[in-house]
């Protein structure tokens, strides 16, 4: 009787489990896969429907393609000022230093940014930035970013679970070690276990 009453869950195990397939989730899954981890990616709707696709402005990166006075230090100062100096100093610094490489990486993965007449990535002005700094794809930068991340991620061996709703997190102390998710397409629960 106990076996009859206990629900049977499909069990899946990964080194890394990422919940959310927006820009941050896809990028985290790609990075984990590049470190040779087995990766599961859970998204609540279809892949490509994350809110990131609605981002229009662009990616702030001090590449100096339009104004050669732009540097990561100026970008950092703009970010701190924009956050009224209560931002996390180290995160703002890392963002300013690493964002040009992130834009180049997206381009290597197939993102098609708008171009200057001489072929460099075009950058435009945006509120709070001292120099034109936003790498963009017209007014659909988020959509292009997600497309490039998805295309690259799919070829990295990341297993994607679409239309899954996470119902519970399982923790070992303060560490999340798994989730219970409902597969809305098939109508049953799955138990995902992960090391990270």
Which sequence ranges carry the predicted segments?
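N-terminal Rossmann-like FAD-binding beta1-loop-alpha1 element of flavoenzymes
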Residues: 16-41
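Long alpha-helical scaffolds
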Residues: 32, 165, 194-196
């Amino acid at each position: 009787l106990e076996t009859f009453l206990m629900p049977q869950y499909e069990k899946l195990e990964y080194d890394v489990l990422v919940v959310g397939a927006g820009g941050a989730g896809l990028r985290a899954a790609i990075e984990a896969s590049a470190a040779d981890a087995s990766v599961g990616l859970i998204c609540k709707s279809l892949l490509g429907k994350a809110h990131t696709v609605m981002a229009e402005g662009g990616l702030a990166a001090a590449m100096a393609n339009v104004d050669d006075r732009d540097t990561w230090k100026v970008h950092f100062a703009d970010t701190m000022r924009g956050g009224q100096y209560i931002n996390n100093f180290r995160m703002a610094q890392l963002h300013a230093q690493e964002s040009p490489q992130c834009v180049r990486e997206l381009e290597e993965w197939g993102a098609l940014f708008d171009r200057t007449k001489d072929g460099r990535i075009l950058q435009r002005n945006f509120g709070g930035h001292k120099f034109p700094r936003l790498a963009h794809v017209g007014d659909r930068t988020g959509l292009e970013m997600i497309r490039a991340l998805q295309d690259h991620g799919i070829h990295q061996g990341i297993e994607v679970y679409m239309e899954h709703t996470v119902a519970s997190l399982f923790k070992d102390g303060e560490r999340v070690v798994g989730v219970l998710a409902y597969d809305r397409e098939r109508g049953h629960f799955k138990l995902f276990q992960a090391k990270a």
